[in-house]
Every structure is written in structure tokens, then in C-alpha cells.
């Protein structure tokens, strides 16, 4: 298993931002926006209050290979799924990890309001708005042609309401 504490990401952002502002003399009033460039394909479950329920299961973590194979079988195999999502599902992909969480840590899965990646988590910490970017959503099960969550994901048993709304990386989130 390869996990990281999401509090470490937030602490690093806060410390780096404070150092940058101190070093440059820029005032918080002068900041017009913040952009994050982060690792993808991890999952950070948050509850309805925004509390983190479990460490980030990172992109390197392949614990869900059994679940990935089961999903591919249910959804018609590699060729059919790849045509819609653009890639077959593997054990490191978010959709497989969501099933793993549902099977192995049901209380975390059930208590989660949303599953966020690192980028979405940092945006949530800044704004209180839960989102996922199209650019990182392919491992969640994005229909790359329709730019929406794959309807076929319902066959996996994933609660689609736990997947955050999709946005472009250039969209403004919060104020």
C-alpha cells in the first residue's frame, strides 16, 4: 500500500505560500487566483463536513488489481471500455480503488460524501467546493467523448453521487 496524509499536502501549500509572500512582499490582497499542479489518480475520501476519512491512496498504489479485473469483465472487457474511456482499468486506477474501499473499508466508503484527488482536495481546502478536473478524471471513469461520468460505472456498484462535479482546469472555483 502506498498512502500519504492529505494534511501534509495542505501544510506544504500553506508554508510555501507564506514563504513566497514573505520573500516577494506580495500582499494577500494582491492575489487574484491560485492554481494547483499535483499528482493524479489518488483518492481522498471526505465526509459531508469536509473532514478527511482516510489517507490519500496514491497513484502508485496497485492494491485493487482484483477489483480492476472484475470491473473490466462486468463492463464488457478491455476493448469496449477502452473505446469509451480511452484506457483499460488497472489496479492503480481510481475506479478500482473505489471498489476496493467499498469492499475492504465499507465504513470509509459509506461515510464519504466525495472522493477527491490531490488537486480537488487542495481546491476544496481553499474554497469549500468539491470538484474534479476533466484532465484527472479518466482514471475515475470519465467518458472522454461526452465529458461526463460513464453511465456504465453504475454497473460497478459505485455511488455516482460520491464523484464530484467535473470542471475544466481553467474554470474558476470559489471566489
Q: Model-predicted segments: where are they?
A:
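Residues that scaffold the ATP/ADP-binding catalytic core of kinase and kinase-like folds
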Residues: 55, 67, 71, 125
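Gly/Ser/Thr-rich active-site cleft segment
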Residues: 81-175
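A broad, structural surface signal
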Residues: 7, 11-18, 22, 69, ...
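Residue-level structural signal for beta-strand termini and adjacent loop
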Residues: 57-58, 136
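Gly/Ser-rich phosphate-binding catalytic loop and adjacent alpha/beta segment
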Residues: 64, 74, 87-91
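N-terminal glycine/serine-rich phosphate-binding loop of ATP-dependent small-molecule kinases
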Residues: 1-54, 66, 111, 164
Amino acid at each position: 500500500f502506498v498512502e500519504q496524509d492529505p494534511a501534509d499536502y495542505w501544510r506544504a501549500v500553506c508554508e510555501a505560500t507564506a514563504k513566497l509572500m514573505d520573500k516577494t512582499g506580495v500582499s494577500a490582497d494582491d492575489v487574484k487566483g491560485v492554481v494547483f499542479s499535483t499528482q493524479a489518480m489518488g483518492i481522498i475520501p471526505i465526509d459531508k463536513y469536509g473532514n478527511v476519512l482516510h489517507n490519500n491512496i496514491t497513484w502508485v498504489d496497485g492494491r485493487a488489481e482484483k477489483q480492476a479485473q472484475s470491473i473490466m469483465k462486468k463492463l464488457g472487457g478491455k476493448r469496449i471500455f477502452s473505446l469509451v474511456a480511452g484506457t483499460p482499468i488497472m489496479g492503480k486506477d481510481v475506479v478500482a480503488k473505489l471498489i476496493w474501499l467499498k469492499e475492504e473499508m465499507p465504513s470509509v466508503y459509506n461515510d464519504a460524501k466525495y472522493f477527491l484527488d490531490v488537486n480537488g482536495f487542495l481546491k476544496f481546502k481553499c474554497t469549500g467546493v468539491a470538484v474534479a478536473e476533466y484532465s484527472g478524471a479518466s482514471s475515475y471513469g470519465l467518458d472522454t467523448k461526452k465529458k461526463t461520468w460513464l453511465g456504465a460505472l453504475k454497473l460497478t456498484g459505485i455511488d455516482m453521487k460520491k464523484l464530484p462535479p467535473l470542471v475544466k482546469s481553467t474554470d474558476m472555483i470559489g471566489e
